[in-house]
Amino acid sequence: MKATQTLIATTKELPKEAVLISHQYMLKAGLIKKLASGIYTWMPLGLKVLQKIQNIVRDEMNKAGASELLLPSILPSELLQETHRWDKFGPELLKLHDRHNRDFCYGPTHEEPIVDMARDTIKSYKQLPLNLYQIQTKFRDEIRPRFGVMRAREFIMKDAYSFHENSQCLRNTYNTMYATYCNILDKIGLAYRPVKADTGAIGGDNSHEFQVLANAGEDIICYSNGSDYAANIELATYAKPDLSKRVNSQNTIEKIHTPNIKTIEKLYKEMSFDIKKTIKTMVIKDAGGNFFALVIRGDHELNETKINKLDQIIAPYTLATKEEIFSIFNANPGSLGIYNCPISIIADYSAIAITDLVCGANEDDYHFTNVNWDRDVTNYQIADIRNVVTGDISPDCKGTLELTNGIEVGHIFELEDVYSKPMNANIIGQDGKSKPMLMGCYGFGVSRVMAAAIEQSHDENGIIWPESIAPYQVAILPINYNKSDKVKEVADKLYQDLLGDGIDVLLDDRGARPGVMFADADLIGYSHHVVIGDKLLEQGLIEYKNRKTQEKQEITIAELIKILK
C-alpha cells in the first residue's frame, strides 16, 4: 500500500477522557475516531490490525473444528424472555422497537439466538458434538464507557457455542477451546495467563479467563512462581496453615484502653502492635437477614465472591449498618472482636493460625490482647474468606503466589443446560430419550485484544505491535521522495520487490518532512523501518530500524531482505 492511497490521520490532539495509553495512541495514530460516547469508527490502519487479529482467530477456530456462521445483531424480545434475560439484563440492554411496535434489542451476547437455531436444526445425538462461532459486533449500553475500545459500548467479539450430548463430550471441547485460545494468543505474540475464574450466575464447575498481562489491567490475577497454578483474585486460594502446630499460649487476656483507635492502621502504628497479630472483625447480613462476624488477619482483605459461596451464607450479603452493629454489640465498628462475640463467627484460616492475637473488646475505646482460639473463643467456623496476597504458599504447595494486573480478553464456560433447558433445545440421546443439549460458550474480545496489545507493548514514541498484527510489517520511508529521482527509483523498486515476496509493506510517498515520517512510523508502530536517502545510497546502503529494539543499522538491500525473510 502507498501512503497516498490510504488515510493516515495522525494527530496531536487528545480528549481529556483519554487516560489509558492504548486509548491515547489509538486516537493519535489515527486507528480509531470517536463518533459518540463509546462508539468508534475504525480507520483504515486500525481496521487492518483488527482484520489481522480476526484472521488469526478464524484460522485457529477452524483448525479446532469449529464452523463459522453469522447471527443477527438485532434480536427479538421473545427470545430473551424465554430465559428471563429481557428484564434481568438491566439498562445495558439497548432496547428498540420497529414500526409495528414489536420489541427488539441490539445483541449484547448471542446465547438465545444460537439456541433457537440449534433447537430447530439439531434433533439427534448423532449430530453432536458441534461447535459454531461468529465474529460479530455487539452492543452494551455502558453507563460510563471509558478507556477507548477497552470498554466501549459497541465492540467486536468472537463468540462460540458448542453443543453436546453428555458432560464428557462437553469437557473435551472445553479443553480444545482452552488450547485454541492459548494458540491464538501465542500466534498474536502476547504475554498472557489462563486463570481459573468464577462462573458467577452461570454456575458449573469450569471457567477460565485469558488475561493479557499489563499494568493498566483492571483485573488482579495471581500465579505461582513454582507451578502452573493461576487464578483470578476472586477465586485464588492458598495452602492452608497447619493449625495443629499452633503453640498453646500461657499469656492471659489483657484489656487495654485504646481511645479513638478505630482502624487497624492506627492500632499497629500508634500502639506498636505487629499487624500480623491483629484481626479485623466485620459484620455482614445475608439475604435471609442472618448476621455473621467475619474475621480476617489485620493485613488481609475480604473476598466477596468466596463469602457469597459459603454454605452458611444466603447470598447476596451486605455489610451491616452502624445502627445494626450497635444494636448487636453495644459498640461501634472499629471496636469489635471475637471474645464474647454475640453472633456466629466465620474466621479465615490465616486468622485462626494467630496466637496471642489483638482484637476489639466489643466496647468502644478498648481492645483485648493475648486472645487465643479454642482457649478463649470456642464457637467459630473456619473458611477461606480473604484475598490472597503476594508470598502466600501456592495451593499446590509448589512455590509462592505473586500478583499482577491483567486485561481479560477471553472467557470460556461450561454452560451445561442453563440456556438449552428453558428454551427446550432437546435432542434424542443414545438411550432413545429426549433431553436438553449441554453447551459450552467461548468468548474472545477481538477489538479489546488490540488495546491490550498496546498496553502491554509501547514506548514514549508510540505503539510497538507484535509483528503478527502490525498494520504493516515494513514501512519504506524515502527522504525527498518527490525531489530525488534516485531515491524514488530505489524506493519504488524495493516496494515492488517486497510486495512480490508477500511482505506487507507501506511506501510513505506523501513527500512529508523526515521528522514527520519518522514520528508517524514510530507512533503507528510499523515493525520494520527502512529509510532511503541520497547520502547512504551513494554508498549502496539504506538505514534499517527495528521498531521493537530501536536498533539501527546501515545495510544493503540484500541484507535487508534476509532480515525480513
UniProtKB/Swiss-Prot annotation:
Which is a GO BP term held by this UniProt record?
prolyl-tRNA aminoacylation
Q: Where in the cell is it found?
A: Cytoplasm
**What InterPro entries does this protein's entry cite?**
aa-tRNA-synt_IIb, aa-tRNA-synth_II, aa-tRNA-synth_II/BPL/LPL, Anticodon-bd, Anticodon-bd_dom_sf, Pro-tRNA-ligase_IIa, Pro-tRNA-synth_IIa_bac-type, Pro-tRNA-Synthase_IIa_type1
In terms of superkingdom, the source organism counts as: Bacteria
Pfam family membership, one = HGTP_anticodon
What reactions does this protein catalyze? tRNA(Pro) + L-proline + ATP = L-prolyl-tRNA(Pro) + AMP + diphosphate
Query: Which SUPFAM superfamilies does the annotation name?
Result: Class II aaRS ABD-related, Class II aaRS and biotin synthetases, YbaK/ProRS associated domain
Q: What is its EC number?
A: 6.1.1.15
The Gene Ontology CC terms held by the record are: cytosol
Q: Which Gene Ontology molecular-function terms are recorded?
A: aminoacyl-tRNA deacylase activity; ATP binding; proline-tRNA ligase activity
What keyword terms does UniProt attach to this protein?
Aminoacyl-tRNA synthetase, ATP-binding, Cytoplasm, Ligase, Nucleotide-binding, Protein biosynthesis
Role played: Catalyzes the attachment of proline to tRNA(Pro) in a two-step reaction: proline is first activated by ATP to form Pro-AMP and then transferred to the acceptor end of tRNA(Pro). As ProRS can inadvertently accommodate and process non-cognate amino acids such as alanine and cysteine, to avoid such errors it has two additional distinct editing activities against alanine. One activity is designated as 'pretransfer' editing and involves the tRNA(Pro)-independent hydrolysis of activated Ala-AMP.
- UniProt subunit comment: Homodimer.
Q: Which family does it belong to?
A: Belongs to the class-II aminoacyl-tRNA synthetase family. ProS type 1 subfamily.
Present the record's domain note.
Answer: Consists of three domains: the N-terminal catalytic domain, the editing domain and the C-terminal anticodon-binding domain.
Name of the protein: Proline--tRNA ligase
This chain's source organism reads Francisella tularensis subsp. mediasiatica (strain FSC147)
Q: What is the lineage of its organism?
A: Bacteria, Pseudomonadati, Pseudomonadota, Gammaproteobacteria, Thiotrichales
